[in-house]
Amino acid sequence: DFIVDTCMEIVENYDIDAIHFDDYFYISGADDSKTREKYNTEGLSLGDFRRKQVDLFIEDLSNHLRSYNTTNNRCVQLGISPSNVYRNGGYSSTPRYDESGNLISPLYSNTGGFAHYDDYLYSDTLNWINHEWIDYIMPQCYHSLENKYAPYADCIRCWSWAVRYKKVNLYAG
């Protein structure tokens, strides 16, 4: 609630275009064992628990911003700038979607670099895109076309597939 309230205080008191998160959420080595012990009533794994907490935050902030925008005839956006790799894995040249336009495959990019879904950030940005909780995504695609771990073209292609049928803009960072 504190972070959502802080964001809304900024939105309500300053003429801004967006709330933007960059290099966000869980820091490397964070010990939240006492929090998990108290609130993890579903027995989720560390990764699933953390992703759920971040999902709940993003959804809550999104709902607050949409309500504010509707009430005040504004268009303050919510944006995220994640690391360029969602998840590592195999490659497919043809995306597949469900009836809601959610990307079902590939859920992994043809990469071997740091991935924010599993590594310590535990952020399910594809879920945020699928639910349209964010207005834009600006992945940190800083690698060259020839980078062997996270080639630019492979990363940006996967992101373009993820937003194809969603009301989420893709900006290359």
Predicted regions and their residues:
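Surface-exposed substrate-engagement region within the catalytic domains
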Residues: H131, L145-G173
